[in-house]
């Protein structure tokens, strides 16, 4: 699933729910919230289908770049695991900024804290992730 698939799913859901939305000013918020939920769902499914993905990619074993690809996938998995370990509110802020690419202002409105708190929490999250990932990969 790609980012385009996620966006398509969000707009399909909007189309299905269009008749139930009374305030068209809230569509932007609804879209952001639905996109966030789709991204979370993507990560849940990716985590659940990890073994299936490995089976589907057995042909990679003959690839000359296998070592590098395995290291990259392992690093991505470590980062995903560390993100999953974050408290829900911090994980939400991180995902909204890094994966959904929302502005600090948009995130602050969605989670109900000031823009400065969002910036501060993102700084702390990034520092924590760097520290924990570095420990796990032995850097």
What is each residue range found by the language model?
Residues 78-86:
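Short amphipathic alpha-helical boundary/capping segments
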Residues 36, 105, 110-135:
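DNA-recognition helix of helix-turn-helix
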Residues 19-23, 33-54, 72, 124:
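Arg/Lys-rich amphipathic alpha helix in sigma70-family domain 2
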Residues 17, 42, 89, 110, ...:
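Residue cluster at the C-terminal edge of the helix-turn-helix DNA-binding motif
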Residues 1-9, 17-25, 137-139:
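Short, charged helix-capping/linker segments at alpha-helix termini
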Residues 93-97:
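A short pre-motif secondary-structure segment
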């Amino acid at each position: 699933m790609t980012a385009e698939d996620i966006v398509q799913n969000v707009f399909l859901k909007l189309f299905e729910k269009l008749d139930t939305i009374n305030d068209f000013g809230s569509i932007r918020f609804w879209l952001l919230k639905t996109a966030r939920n789709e991204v979370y769902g993507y990560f849940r499914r990716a985590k659940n289908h990890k073994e299936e993905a490995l089976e589907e990619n057995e042909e990679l074993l003959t690839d000359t770049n296998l070592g590098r690809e395995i290291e990259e996938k392992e690093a991505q998995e470590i980062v995903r695991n560390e993100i999953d370990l974050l408290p829900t509110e911090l994980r939400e802020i991180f995902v909204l900024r890094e994966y959904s690419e929302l502005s600090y202002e948009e995130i602050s409105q969605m989670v109900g804290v000031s823009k400065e708190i969002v910036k501060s929490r993102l700084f702390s999250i990034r520092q924590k992730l760097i520290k924990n990932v570095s420990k796990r990969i032995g850097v």
